[in-house]
Amino acid sequence: MKKWLGFSLTPPLRICNSEEEELRHDGSDVWRYDINFDHHHHDEDVPKVEDLLSNSHQTEYPINHNQTNVNCTTVVNRLNPPGYLLHDQTVVTPHYPNLDPNLSNDYGGFERVGSVSVFKSWLEQGTPAFPLSSHYVTEEAGTSNNISHFSNEETGYNTNGSMLSLALSHGACSDLINESNVSARVEEPVKVDEKRKRLVVKPQVKESVPRKSVDSYGQRTSQYRGVTRHRWTGRYEAHLWDNSCKKEGQTRRGRQVYLGGYDEEEKAARAYDLAALKYWGPTTHLNFPLSNYEKEIEELNNMNRQEFVAMLRRNSSGFSRGASVYRGVTRHHQHGRWQARIGRVAGNKDLYLGTFSTQEEAAEAYDIAAIKFRGLNAVTNFDINRYDVKRICSSSTIVDSDQAKHSPTSSGAGH
């Protein structure tokens, strides 16, 4: 309550001497409201603050010995005309001597609920909305007493003689004005700066479309089973995982079987399908329908796994690091002749077999060396029945192609 009013409701008692007379700026006497109280009139009724603040009780109280009557409500309304706001006005509080010993010194009536409600109703009915002003001084003509504004700078209290208005302090009024401004601002529509709006773009859901060979450039994966793309050359390679064998030291059973490199993704996928049919039969998963491989199924039935894989490699577009379709044959990059090599025979290194004018001569040289080191299980470019296997295996050196081919073969050449 005290914070809302901006002043204390329990002011100290103050009795002014009757000898104190103040002069206005024009030299006239100033009538003081809080003087000329008789300390011996204990039987007289003492006015209460509730009666001063109530609009319904317009009781006139004697002020001095001259029986000067001042109507409190009239003075309040007179001194607070509409259109003025007392900013710098000090709070006016009437000071009465404690004439009744039964009354408390702290004017506890303001602290009761009824007094607070009366004061609020007085504020709502008797105090209009005031515009801002710095000073307010009023003089009432035609009355027996001169009323003027007088402020006591020493005590900080307004000692205006007949001014009984309890004006709101500057802080309380500013709080009320601020509250009204806040309510007005809430009712205003909120304006949004269009320039600072963020454009929230919802991500469009992309439909899953099967990848094409052009879209998968630079990626190692493919839309086909068993096909990968070389990260450097961009060519497609086909691989098959053979889980029928396990070497020592391997954590995963089986080995990867290389089926050759291809320029087109579909060719690599077909090579995988043919190898899968040879290893696991027609019930395996394929990239294309089984009806597309009717002719190839007849051929693969006449060969074992190694021979069929060798045939797939020879038919690939980039076999054995060169342009030749034969196993172990490469083309020299300077003079363009064909070279034959075989690997993993001499200390796990490649063995150079010579340079030849044609791919077929180089391929025959590779077949003879493969039979020499691997026997009848060797994977050759041509049919192994063309060669004299016993003579090749019994020789301490690698024989030439003429000696290897013309030698008669009795038996044991069927794989």
Swiss-Prot record:
The keyword Transcription regulation is annotated on this UniProt entry: yes
GO molecular function, one term: DNA-binding transcription factor activity
UniProt GO cellular component terms: nucleus
Location(s), subcellular: Nucleus
Tissue: Expressed in roots, seedlings, inflorescence, and siliques. Also detected at low levels in leaves.
Main location: nucleus
A biological-process GO annotation: ethylene-activated signaling pathway
Sequence similarity: Belongs to the AP2/ERF transcription factor family. AP2 subfamily.
Protein name: AP2-like ethylene-responsive transcription factor AIL1
Organism, as annotated: Arabidopsis thaliana
Gene name linked to the record: AIL1
